[in-house]
């Protein structure tokens, strides 16, 4: 299963010094991180500010929860299960056919 993880580094309401300390702690924690067994990181990108996306694949959702849990102290996170668009198109077509026949 693939998951798109959206993150925003939390800085709202922090003082100048707290913001620096928060970023410093996050960078130190991230420098020691390695993906757990069973977590395939397909893309890890930043918008060059305080937000980013991580596309991961894992058979066990607990592996994804473990990854997210490690960084939730610094980030607001949203996890969305996703499928490849080539898989989504026939599903959408079948759903449309069903909806047309349902009414």
Residue ranges and their predicted role:
Residues 1-103:
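Conserved, structured core segments of small domains
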